[in-house]
């Protein structure tokens, strides 16, 4: 999957510096693309990860066997209601079902994904409210990035891409990019 996105990126911008930023599966893709760009000798000026963890650190078999955590199911219901309310009658439940299907596809893709070593610096924004117990970002990402800068966010995974979260994330990114 990274190779497909890498080809698309290179068709638009054959040479760096590259600025990559991704959330969840998108972060996994951004990290994999960054690694491949560096292997080609290209400059990756920024790699931002929004609550992204190496797929190797997730126990997918356990998650599949146990089904979704009740807290996760409650969060999905909350998100569905918030989404439908925000659409003010412009979207249907079918649209949210399609979004849920995309989420299920992302989880399926992550079960077979493998991280590649990126020798540069990554900036990770961690959603502290849903961080798995014992997940130390420096330890977990150590084998996969050359350097890691971590910024904790007081939110859940699904909320790290909300306007409220970006009120805190935006200034950090602006400062880094100078």
Model regions: which residues?
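A hydrolase-biased, glycine/serine/histidine/acidic-enriched motif that marks catalytic-domain neighborhoods
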Residues: 1-178
């Amino acid at each position: 999957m990274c190779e497909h996105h890498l080809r698309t990126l290179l068709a638009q911008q054959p040479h760096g510096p590259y600025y990559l930023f991704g959330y969840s599966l998108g972060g996994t893709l951004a990290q994999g693309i960054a690694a491949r760009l560096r292997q080609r000798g290209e400059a990756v000026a920024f790699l931002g990860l929004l609550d992204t963890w190496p797929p190797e650190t997730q126990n997918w078999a356990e998650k599949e066997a146990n089904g979704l955590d009740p807290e996760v199911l409650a969060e999905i219901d909350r998100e569905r209601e918030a989404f439908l309310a925000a659409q003010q009658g412009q979207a249907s439940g079918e649209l949210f079902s399609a979004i849920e299907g995309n989420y299920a596809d992302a989880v399926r893709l992550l079960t077979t994904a493998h991280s590649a070593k990126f020798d540069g610096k990554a900036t990770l924004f961690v959603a502290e409210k849903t961080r798995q117990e014992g997940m130390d970002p420096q330890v977990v990402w150590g084998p996969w990035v050359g350097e890691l800068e971590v910024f904790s966010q007081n939110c859940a995974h699904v909320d790290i891409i909300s306007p409220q979260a970006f009120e805190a994330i935006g200034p950090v990114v602006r400062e880094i990019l100078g």
